[in-house]
């Protein structure tokens, strides 16, 4: 039970004493009203889809094709471009009509969802159990809850397969690693080798290992979606046709608030993973649309100055910097030739504009002298001046502030927002998990307002 300072407060004809919930717990009204809760869910989905459609059209109306996508404060169009819509070689946007269509479709969908939300909130039955038993439920009905879990898993699995179908059969997806600087490509041979796909999960998250954030080719990304989509669909079928085993019945708390806590915990974890993925990965999040990663901007600057000074006659292989280490090139701890200077800390960076210049032992001196292409120079110069950093001084060798006035990288935005949201979801998970466990144990921890020590203390004034 939540505890108010004023236990007699009545809001909307409901008080804390008779309902067990304080006035701010608005959703508590719907705990046992499955029809009204359905209305709230559908209306919430409508609001989400409306935002997506409206923001999509807002970004389309402000989009300037001549400027890089990451320079325009866009967070939705890069996702659509990554799916291969309206994109040409090198990540150039050649058609914005698919983006307009996406926005309109989302707006139309939001209207349908909004109507459904209003209907079920105001007109439809308060509870579904009597009229529509298939859609009705009781929170403690363990079998029904796992059925609902199953339906959710199947929908998630189909969502994963949608990406697979788009990549393999419906025009392909944008691949930043395509020769010549990236292009839309049909993925004809996705990775289905379980050792490769699940190998990412057992990799270290540190350094160049990078856990799942280290995925660096579209074949593995699409193959991973084949695996996850198939497993989720099979898991969904399993949960629909089976009942929870005895150990699961004992281990879990079976209440609405417990399910809320499980969901918040899962979303929190996904938020943290999305934070790392959008910050570090330049394959699932191509730099042509999202801007360079931090290490990528730093390596770009080292590359740009190497190109400039090499043209001016510098011997980039032997020139020393102020510390006595190589000014342009040096060796990594394991012997590879890497860029020198502050960017040495990012020596394990991999990017499609740099990899053609590598040999069997790191950067290839002969290629650096003879094989650098104009598109690599242009891209490095662009990335150098668009670091996803907000420092007043240099970070990783990149002079951030001078070159980044009024520039916020989509990577900065996505990483920071997902970290903050993931953190808040995680705190919500802890809060609701604690309440659910306490309720299941027969007590809810709170401050006893009648015996609170402060009530007997002398007033401050």
Swiss-Prot record:
> Propeptide ranges, please?
1-2
For the modification Phosphothreonine, which residues carry it? 3
Write one Pfam family the protein is assigned to.
PSII
**Where in the cell is the protein located?**
Plastid, Chloroplast thylakoid membrane
Residues bearing the modification N-acetylthreonine: 3
> What modifications follow translation?
Phosphorylated in vitro.
Subunit composition and interactions: PSII is composed of 1 copy each of membrane proteins PsbA, PsbB, PsbC, PsbD, PsbE, PsbF, PsbH, PsbI, PsbJ, PsbK, PsbL, PsbM, PsbT, PsbX, PsbY, PsbZ, Psb30/Ycf12, at least 3 peripheral proteins of the oxygen-evolving complex and a large number of cofactors. It forms dimeric complexes.
The protein's name in its UniProt record: Photosystem II CP43 reaction center protein
């Amino acid at each position: 039970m939540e505890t108010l300072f004023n236990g007699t407060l009545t809001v909307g004809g409901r008080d804390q004493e008779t309902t067990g919930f304080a006035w701010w717990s608005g959703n508590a009204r719907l705990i046992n009203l499955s029809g009204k809760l359905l209305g709230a869910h559908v209306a919430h989905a409508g609001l989400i889809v409306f935002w997506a459609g409206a923001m999509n059209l807002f970004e389309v109306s402000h989009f300037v094709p001549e400027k890089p996508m990451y320079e325009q404060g866009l967070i939705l169009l890069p996702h659509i471009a990554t799916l291969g819509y309206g994109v040409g070689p090198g990540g150039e946007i050649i058609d914005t009509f698919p983006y307009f269509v996406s926005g309109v479709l989302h707006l139309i969908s939001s209207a349908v969802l909004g109507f459904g939300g209003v209907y079920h909130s105001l007109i439809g039955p308060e509870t579904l159990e009597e009229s529509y038993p298939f859609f009705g439920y009781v929170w403690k009905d363990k079998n029904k809850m796992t059925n609902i879990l199953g339906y959710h898993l199947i929908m998630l699995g189909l969502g994963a397969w949608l990406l697979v179908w788009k990549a393999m059969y419906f025009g392909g997806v944008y691949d930043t690693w395509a020769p010549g600087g990236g292009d839309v490509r049909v993925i004809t041979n996705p990775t289905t080798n379980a050792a490769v796909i699940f190998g990412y999960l057992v990799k270290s998250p540190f350094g160049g290992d990078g856990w799942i954030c280290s995925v660096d080719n579209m074949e593995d990304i699409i193959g991973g979606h084949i695996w996850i989509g198939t497993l989720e669909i099979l898991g969904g079928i399993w949960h629909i046709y089976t009942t929870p085993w005895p150990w699961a019945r004992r281990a879990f708390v079976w209440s609405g608030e417990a399910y809320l806590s499980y969901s918040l915990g899962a979303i929190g974890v996904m938020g943290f993973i999305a934070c790392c993925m959008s910050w570090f990965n330049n394959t699932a999040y191509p730099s042509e649309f999202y801007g360079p990663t931090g290490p990528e901007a730093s390596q770009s600057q080292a590359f740009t100055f190497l190109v400039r000074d090499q043209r001016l006659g510098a011997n980039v292989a032997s020139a020393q910097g102020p510390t006595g280490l190589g000014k342009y090139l040096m060796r990594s701890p394991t012997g590879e030739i890497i860029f020198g200077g502050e960017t040495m800390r990012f020596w394990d960076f991999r990017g499609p504009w740099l990899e053609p210049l590598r040999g069997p032992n790191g950067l290839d001196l002969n290629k650096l002298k003879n094989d650098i292409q104009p598109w690599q120079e242009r891209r490095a110069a662009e990335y150098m001046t668009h670091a996803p950093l907000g420092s007043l001084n240099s970070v990783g060798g990149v002079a951030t502030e001078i070159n980044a006035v009024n520039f916020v990288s989509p990577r900065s935005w996505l990483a920071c927002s997902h970290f903050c949201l993931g953190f808040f979801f995680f705190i919500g998970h802890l809060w609701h998990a604690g309440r659910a466990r306490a309720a299941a144990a027969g007590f809810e921890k709170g401050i006893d307002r009648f015996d609170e020590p402060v009530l007997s203390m002398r007033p401050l004034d």
